[in-house]
Amino acid sequence: NLTGHDNIVTSVTKAENNDISTEEAISNVDPQDLMEVLFSTADETETEPLAIGIAASPGAATGKLCLSVDAVLETVDAGEEAIMFAMETGPEDEPGMRWSSGIATAHGGLASHAAIYSRGLGLPAVCGIAELNVTESSIDIGGVTINEGSEISINGTTGEVHAGKIHISEAETPSELTTLLDWCDQARHNLIGV
C-alpha cells in the first residue's frame, strides 16, 4: 500500500520510462493522494476526538486555544501556534484568522465564512461542531471544558477536534507532482479542444 507521495512518484516515473501512458499515470493517482501531498495530516492518535464537526478545509493543526483576534495576535507574537475557536466568524475576525494555524466554529458548514476564508488561506478548519460552546475564557466541547491558552488540535480533513497536541506530518510535495499536473492540463486541453 503506497503513500500518496510514493504513488505519485511511481506513476510519473513509470510513465517517463514508457512503462505506462501518461493517461494511466493520471488515473493511478487518487484525489486522496493529492490531499496527502498538499496538506499537513494528523498521524493516527490513540485518543478519541472530543467532537467531530464538518471537515471544512483540509489539513491539521495543533496550537494554543484562542477565543479572540487579540488572543491570536498575542499568541503568534509570543512565537506560538494559535487555533482560533468561535461560535461563528465574520469579517471582524479576519485579522485573527489570517494569523491562526487553524480555525474551528460551532456554527456553519462548507459555505460558511470560516470555511471559505480558511480554504482561501490554505488553513485547516472544522465547522458546525454541534457540541461546541464558546465562552469568554474557555470552550465546552463534548462535556469537557478547555481554557483559553491550552493546547488543542483540529483535523480539517476529518472534522475531528482533540484536546492537547497531536502529531502532525507536514505535507511533502514531490517534484513529480508538477509533471503530473502538466499532463493533466494537456489531457484536459485535448478533451475540450482548447
Enumerate the predicted regions with their spans.
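Cysteine-dependent phosphatase catalytic core of the protein tyrosine phosphatase
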Residues: 1-74
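Acidic, glycine-rich flexible loop/linker segments
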Residues: 2, 41, 48, 59-72, ...
